[in-house]
Structure formats: structure tokens, C-alpha cells
Amino acid sequence: MEKLFKGIAKFRREDFESHRQLFKELGRKQQPHTLFIGCSDSRVVPELITRTRPGELFMIRNVANIVPPYRKTEDFAGTTSAIEYAVHVLDVEAIVVCGHSNCGGCAALHKSPEELQHIPNVARWLDASHEVKERVKKQVVEGTPGAVADRVLEELEATKRREPVGSLAG
């Protein structure tokens, strides 16, 4: 925790002061141009890889950068509610679903229910990608390296998501 507190203090002293006007504007209103849906993995830093500044990306981060099917629900729906907000309130221009290599969430998609029983919420979350995983398994040639298979899975899932996400704008 000490490292975090020192980082916050240094940010206030250095970064905040050198970008005071930007943060003043962001304090009044946000107008991100892009909804960025990415993995919670600590190695993925969206602002760093996209070279964007505070206020440019509206971000959703979750295990395996999954976008569950859109539906009205009484349950908590963090990802879909953030998409609604970005599309209907913030009027973002673009939506990016960003996968990455060596994703633990994508690797967990290939585990048995028994292997995931100690993380039941993650297991349930990954169920949202079960249909896509099965489709990929039929299309991927046997012997395909795991990383390539995972990348194909991510791409197919992103394709599956386009229609439900796009239908929000209409």
C-alpha cells in the first residue's frame, strides 16, 4: 500500500500539476471517443498501448475481455451497463474489444468445471463464451498451438459481439 500512496502523492505533485487544465476540464465532463473493452490482466495497460490521455477511453476491463450477450436483466450487469452508458450517454465513436496473448481467462475456457470449482464466479463468467469456444473447437485444426487457438477464439468472439453491441446504437 505504501507504494500506491507514494505514487498518488507523486502524481499530485508532478503529473496533475503539469496537466492542470486537462484535469480541470475532465472534472467538469468526460467525452471519450472510444469504448475500450479489455482484459483485467495487470500486464495490459490500455492508455499505454494506445498512447491516449486521460478522458479519451471509456474502459471496461474484465476476465478474458468478454462481452456477454445483451439483455435486460434484474441481475447486476456491469459490462452491459457500461456499454449502454458509453453508447447512449457518452456517444462514443468507436468500440474496441482488445484481446492479448497468454490470457489466463482464455486459458481457463479450456479447463473442466472441476478445475474451476474454486473460482465459481469466474467459471460462470466464462460460460458466456461457451458457445463461441465450441464453434472454434470445430474450426481449429487439431494440433494448433494453444496461443493461436486462443487468438482465433478471441477473434470469433469479437465477431459474435458486433451485432448485439451495434444494435444498442439503433
Task: Give the residues covered by each predicted segment.
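N-terminal low-complexity or amphipathic/hydrophobic leaders
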Residues: 27-46
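Gly/Ser/Thr-rich loops at beta-strand to alpha-helix junctions
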Residues: 41-43, 100-105
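Short beta-strand segments
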Residues: 37-39, 61, 98-100
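Catalytic core of membrane glycerolipid acyltransferases/transacylases, capturing the structured
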Residues: 43-66
